[in-house]
From Swiss-Prot:
GO terms for molecular function: GTP binding; ribosome binding. InterPro entries: G_ENGA (IPR031166), GTP-bd (IPR006073), GTPase_Der (IPR016484), KH_dom-like (IPR032859), KH_dom-like_a/b (IPR015946), P-loop_NTPase (IPR027417), Small_GTP-bd (IPR005225). Associates with the 50S ribosomal subunit. Belongs to the TRAFAC class TrmE-Era-EngA-EngB-Septin-like GTPase superfamily. EngA (Der) GTPase family. Pfam families: KH_dom-like (PF14714), MMR_HSR1 (PF01926). The keyword GTP-binding applies. GTPase that plays an essential role in the late steps of ribosome biogenesis. Residues 352-436 form the KH-like domain. GTP 2 binds at residues 182-189, 229-233, 294-297. This is GTPase Der. GTP 1 binds at residues 9-16, 56-60, 119-122. It comes from Pelobacter propionicus (strain DSM 2379 / NBRC 103807 / OttBd1). Keywords: GTP-binding, Nucleotide-binding, Repeat, Ribosome biogenesis.
Length: 448
């Protein structure tokens, strides 16, 4: 495991701005509204001599009656427990506050390196005023402007000296990236917390509690995973608030980053138009998919209930008919272990490669038993097929009519490959290509 560095401090002191600065691009949502970052957000920072994992946290308020702020404080405390080094950030514009003093007193009891940072030092006056922070009794105080990149590299030089050696996973071990997506308030964060075994993400009945896409590294059955809990995706017309628009874009980017996407559905509401839209994003991105039908405990059941709900999902998502369906209750934990089993199964298929000889055997049988429709009155000839990539598996089929293959025949070939090679939980892609004139002569597949 690479060393962990936690950013902690009051709300709106610039933790997410520094997080994005060190990452090299915007990942955490940055806004003037306090409490925009509500959970622990992880990112691998590999732009410096020593790679490390940076944890961005929600604001830390030592004393509060607000339940959401209490949950954010708990998330910050967990981040401090996980971290090898803590960066405690304060705000030069606000000056030293009683909350800063409370956090500093708590950090004195932490037996790990703490770096005290005053952010938003954007001019000489603020530089002079920041001297008051020395009253905390610290020897080294870093004055920076994360927004303008002032003092950040000096901070990084000293941080790298404090980092322990990487005790990371064995070489060659790959991390499966899992995105959790769905409409607001279908139970995504509750599912994440259930899978991880502790409250990793702020789960709240209020729709939109998760605003950032929150990354969590974890181990399951001795295998590493990166779990991405996304903000709920709403209809475009309903994302009027600026932060909501940021979050939807971030959720779509999370789908692009993932290997496997868990599409969480609410069993009590059935399949909605917005569910179909979200699943469409997953399909277009070409990611492996598992449908997680949550709140199954709230459904009254008889012998036909299971089959009826399977039919509802299959009817609503015809283009994802290959994706497995898991019925769970994130609240009670019912069948949630099946989720990771399904992730492993579809990931194996998502990464599977078949030999060219086996592929062409199936390809020849498929084109011989069912001929392609004529294209512009001409017979379609197929020459051979080869797999060019995985994740998702992609095949190139060479033919004399690459631009005239009917989509129904493409679907037929995909289904033949799926059945023959066990690609039951992953999208498949076929590219039709003409023979290059300079390539060796090849005979068409027999009887096609």
């Amino acid at each position: 495991m690479k060393p962990l560095v936690a950013l902690v401090g009051r709300p709106n002191v610039g933790k997410s701005t520094l997080f994005n600065r060190l990452l090299g691009h915007r990942r955490a949502i940055v806004d003037d509204t306090p409490g925009v970052t509500r959970d622990r957000n992880y990112a691998l920072i590999n732009r410096f001599e020593k790679p490390f994992i940076l944890i961005d946290t929600g604001g830390f308020e030592p004393v509060t009656e607000d339940r959401l702020l209490q949950q954010m404080r708990e998330q910050s405390s967990l981040a401090m427990e996980e971290a090898d080094v803590i960066i405690f950030m304060m705000d030069a514009r606000s000056g030293l506050t009683p909350a800063d003093v409370e956090v500093a007193n708590m950090l004195r009891r932490v037996k790990k390196p703490v770096m005290y940072v005053v952010n938003k030092v954007d001019g000489e006056k603020l530089e002079n005023d920041s001297a008051e922070f020395y009253s905390l009794g610290v020897e080294n105080l870093y004055t920076i402007s994360a927004e303008h990149n002032r003092g950040v590299y000096d901070l990084m030089d000293d941080l790298l000296e404090l980092l322990p050696l990487d005790s990371g996973p064995e070489s060659g071990e790959e991390i499966t990236r899992i995105a959790v997506v769905g409409r607001p308030n279908v139970g995504k964060s509750s599912l994440v917390n259930r899978l991880l075994g502790f409250e990793r993400v702020v789960a709240n009945p209020t729709a939109g509690t998760t605003r950032d896409s929150v990354d969590t590294l974890f181990m399951c059955n001795k295998k590493p995973y990166l779990l991405i809990d996304t903000a709920g995706i709403r209809r475009k017309g309903k994302t009027t608030e600026k932060l909501e628009k940021y979050s939807v874009v971030d959720a779509l980017r999370s789908i692009e980053r993932a290997d496997v996407v868990l599409v969480v559905l609410d069993a009590t509401q059935g399949v909605t138009e917005q569910d179909e839209r979200i699943a469409g994003y997953v399909h277009e991105a070409g990611r492996a998919c598992v449908f997680v039908l949550n709140k199954w405990d709230a459904i009254e059941k008889d012998n036909s209930t299971f089959g009826l709900y399977v039919d509802k999902v299959r009817t609503g998502f015809k283009y994802l008919a290959y994706a497995p369906i898991v019925f769970v209750s994130a609240m009670t934990g019912q069948r949630t272990a099946k989720v990771m089993e399904s992730v492993d199964e579809v990931m194996e298929q998502f990464s599977r490669r078949v030999t060219t000889s086996d592929l062409n055997r199936v390809f020849s049988e498929a084109t011989s038993s069912h001929h392609a429709p004529l294209a512009h009155g001409r017979r379609v000839k197929f020459y051979f097929a080869t797999q060019v990539t995985t994740r998702p598996p992609c095949f190139v089929v060479f033919t004399n009519q690459p631009d005239s293959i009917h989509f129904s025949y493409e679907r037929y070939l995909i289904n033949q490959f799926r059945e023959a090679f066990g690609f039951n939980g992953t999208p498949l892609r076929i590219i039709f290509r003409g023979r290059e004139k300079n390539s060796p002569s090849r005979r068409p597949v027999k009887d096609s």
